[in-house]
Amino acid sequence: MRIGFGYDVHRLVEGRPLILGGVQVPHDRGLAGHSDADVLLHAVADALLGAAALGDLGAHFPDTDAKWKDADSQALLRRVVERVQHAGYAPHNVDATVLLERPKLRPHVDEMRTNIARALSFPRDAVSVKATTTEGIGFVGREEGVAAQAACTIQSA
C-alpha cells in the first residue's frame, strides 16, 4: 500500500466557469488555468501520481503544450489512472478537501464523488469529498482563488 498527497490552487476570474470535481458549479467567477482548471481533480491526480512516484501533473500534461489547452480534467484524471496502472498499481481510495469561501458545495458533493469514482473505476464509497472555508483568512478567504488537497492510497495490482 502506498500513500500520495496532492495540492492545487487556481485564481478566481470572471468569464470562466467554476468546475470542481467535474461539476459546473453556479458562480459569478471561475478558475483561471490552461485546462478547465478543476483544482479538485488536479489535486486527486497529483496524489495518485505521487503515490506511484510518477512525478506531478505538470510533468505529464504541461501547460506549455497547446493540446492540453482547455482540457477536461476528468479525461486527464483517467489518463493518470492509466499511467498508475501501467506502473503496476491500482487506486484504492481518495479523501479530498476543497477550500473556498463560496459558493457552498454541499449540493454538488455527491456528483463530484461519483465523477471521481467513475474516473478511478472504483466504488463511490471509496471517495470522500469535503469543502471548507478559511474563515476569511488568506487568498481563499479574500476570494482570490480556490485550493484543493487530496490524499489517496494505491496498492499493487
UniProtKB/Swiss-Prot annotation:
GO BP, one annotated term: isopentenyl diphosphate biosynthetic process, methylerythritol 4-phosphate pathway
InterPro entries the UniProt entry points to: MECDP_synthase, MECDP_synthase_CS, MECDP_synthase_sf
Catalyzed chemical reaction(s): 4-CDP-2-C-methyl-D-erythritol 2-phosphate = 2-C-methyl-D-erythritol 2,4-cyclic diphosphate + CMP
Cofactors (names): a divalent metal cation
PROSITE patterns assigned to the protein according to its UniProt record, in alphabetical order: ISPF
Pfam families according to UniProt: YgbB
Keywords carried by this UniProt record: Isoprene biosynthesis, Lyase, Metal-binding
Residue sites binding 4-CDP-2-C-methyl-D-erythritol 2-phosphate per the record: 8-10, 34-35, 56-58, 61-65, 132-135, 139, 142
PANTHER family xref list: 2-C-METHYL-D-ERYTHRITOL 2,4-CYCLODIPHOSPHATE SYNTHASE, CHLOROPLASTIC
Oligomeric and partner information: Homotrimer.
Family label: Belongs to the IspF family.
HAMAP family noted in UniProt: IspF
Protein name: 2-C-methyl-D-erythritol 2,4-cyclodiphosphate synthase
Taxonomy of the source species: Bacteria, Pseudomonadati, Rhodothermota, Rhodothermia, Rhodothermales
